[in-house]
Each structure stands twice: as C-alpha cells, then as structure tokens.
Amino acid sequence: QYEPSSGGRMMNSHYGTRSLDPLGQWKNLTSQINSSSDISPTASQMPRLLGLAFASKLFRNNKALDAFTHFSNNGDEVAFGTIGNASTSEGHFFEIMNAAGILQIPMVLAVWDDGYGISVPNTIHTIKESISKVMKGFQREKGTNGIEILVARGWNYPEMSAAFEKAT
C-alpha cells in the first residue's frame, strides 16, 4: 500500500567487497575476504557465481595467469553462493547449473528453501515442490560429469556444517 512499486520486497542489503583502492587500482584480493554483492533481479547472481568459480579454475589450469598473484591463490578458491528456492524457477539458474556441471568448477550453491518464494508456496513455483528433486538429473555419477546434490536442514547447524564441509 505504501510502496506500490515492489510491495515492500526491495532487498536493500546488497553489500560487496571493494576490489579497487581509492586510486582505482586493484587491491590484493588474495589477502582479504571477498564478497560479491547480489543484485535485485531474481537469480541474477548465478552468472556472476559461475564466472567467479570458472576464474578460479582458469587460474589453476592456465600457467599464463601465474603472474597475477593478487587475484588468485593458484586457483584454490571456491566460489560460494546462495539463492532462494523460488529464484531457482528462473531459466538462468538451470543454465548456470548445467554449465557448472559441464565445466566442473569449484562452486558451492546453497538453496534456501522455506517452502515459500517471497510469499508464494512451493506448490505453484517448483515442480515436485523440491529443487533438489528436480535437479536429480544433474547429479554426478561415477565416471561422469555433473554436480553433487546435498540436502541439509538449515535450522540444524551441525547438519549444515557437515554439508558445507563435504561440499568443499
């Protein structure tokens, strides 16, 4: 009522690490914790997440990049990302997950599924009401590429910690 443009759904807490110093020069990204900020359109963080993970793989496999030590620790980085369950209904979510499985990149994605997408129940935005069930065809099998799918209850800290440990 008071904010008709978005119905109060403006996500205004998108924070990120500054990668440039005040003079516009690159900082040493390997000596700081780096966070890439989300952007408002749903699932739009997915292409960036893929790019960060693929960059890590390139730094690991391309010796021509060895001189750029301020960007990577020899490609040992893992790109972590998060997405809400309703945003997994966006097409680029599936495109990125397919590319991640093909490229075999160091990427961990947490899907926060509380049964709703902003205010819409899973029954009307996700087939089978579970993105992990939908993604079963992407599951890596012995001798193939693909992705690992781990399921943990977000409110169970030891279970979540174990899942993240296994993922990395």
Regions found by a protein language model. Give the residues of each.
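Cofactor-binding active-site loop characterized by glycine-rich and histidine/acidic residues
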Residues: 1-103, 110, 121-139, 144
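Short gly/pro/ser/thr-enriched loop/turn and capping motifs at secondary-structure boundaries
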Residues: 115-118
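Short catalytic-loop micro-motif centered on adjacent basic/acidic residues
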Residues: 81-83, 148-153
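Structural signature of the thiamine diphosphate
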Residues: 156-168
